Structure formats: C-alpha cells, structure tokens
Design a protein with these regions (language model features):
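N-terminal Rossmann-like NAD(P)+-binding domain of SDR-like oxidoreductases, especially those catalyzing
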Residues: 1-84
Length: 84
C-alpha cells in the first residue's frame, strides 16, 4: 500500500479561539501534520487554552510547542527542524 505524504503546517496561537479551530479543521482533514505553537499567556483564562490543547493532543498528527513569537532563537530552531 502506498503511503500518502502529509503536508506539515504551522499554526500560531493554537490554544486560542481561532488557532484551535484552524488546527482542529486541518487535523480533521487527515492530510496534514500540524505543529501548533502558543505561549499560553494570561490574556484570558489559561485553563480554557490548556483544555483546548488536551483536545488537540489526542490526535497523533498534532505536535505542540510552547513558544512565544518573540523568542527569535527558538523560532529559528523550529524552522530549522521542520519543513513547512
């Protein structure tokens, strides 16, 4: 059986409202590997964000990286390790 190559995508703010729903939609499609990043800040309820991440992490095609977009070295490393 031929293995289908999945496209890898990056979703920023994956624990927020829009990022969570975008991540869930790509995962539902089954054709994508989703790398979600978020800094889990306290702009609003962090427990809500953590619960969203629990849902996303149930899918083996999802990987979470706790990172802030201002962490330049970590962002560069993420892009060095992944082809998006």
């Amino acid at each position: 059986m031929r293995k289908i190559k999945k496209n890898k995508i990056l979703i920023t703010g994956c624990a927020g409202f829009i990022g969570f729903h975008c991540s869930a939609a790509f995962l539902k499609n089954k054709k994508f590997l989703v790398i979600g990043i978020d800094n889990i800040n306290n702009y609003y309820d962090q427990n809500l964000k953590l619960n969203r991440l629990k849902i996303l992490k149930k899918d083996n095609n999802f990987t979470f990286v706790k990172i802030d977009m201002n962490e330049e070295k970590k962002i560069y490393k993420l892009f060095e390790e992944n082809k998006f």
